[in-house]
């Protein structure tokens, strides 16, 4: 965590407040069939100059954590979160693809594709 001076208290960390909508936007694109996880990450990395995209970050965090967040949002009535949770469970959690901790999530470890110089070359 990064220590900062807060102007006002709020529940949760500042990083999580920023991170959750970012990864949910990426997940929404994938669940709706717009793009795949690697394409979403590649787009973010090329356009934003980041070292990782939302799916690489999810792998590093571990996929159980976003499932818990999505499940809580779904239970609070968020229909999109319910679809995202269902997809994450079906495609990854139930297949024991939990991210870096199991050696596979959206990427395979120890050498994930997003670390390759070729990964950020635009595809045609």
Predicted segments with their positions:
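NAD(P)-dependent Rossmann-like dehydrogenase/reductase catalytic/cofactor-binding core
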Residues: 1-10, 21, 31-32, 37-124
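Amphipathic, non-transmembrane alpha-helical scaffold segments
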Residues: 15-19
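Catalytic, metal-anchored helix/loop core of enzyme active sites in primary metabolism
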Residues: 27
């Amino acid at each position: 965590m990064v220590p900062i001076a807060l102007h006002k208290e709020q529940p949760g960390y500042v990083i999580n407040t920023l991170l959750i909508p970012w990864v949910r936007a990426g997940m929404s694109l994938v669940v709706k069939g717009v793009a795949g996880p690697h394409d979403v990450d590649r787009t973010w990395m090329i356009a934003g100059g980041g070292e990782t995209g939302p799916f690489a970050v999810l792998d590093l965090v571990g996929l159980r954590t976003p499932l818990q967040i999505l499940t809580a949002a779904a239970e609070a009535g968020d229909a999109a979160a319910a679809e995202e949770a269902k997809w994450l469970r079906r495609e990854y959690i139930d297949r024991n693809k939990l991210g870096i901790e199991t050696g596979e999530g959206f990427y395979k470890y120890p050498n994930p594709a997003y670390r390759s110089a070729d990964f950020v070359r635009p595809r045609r």
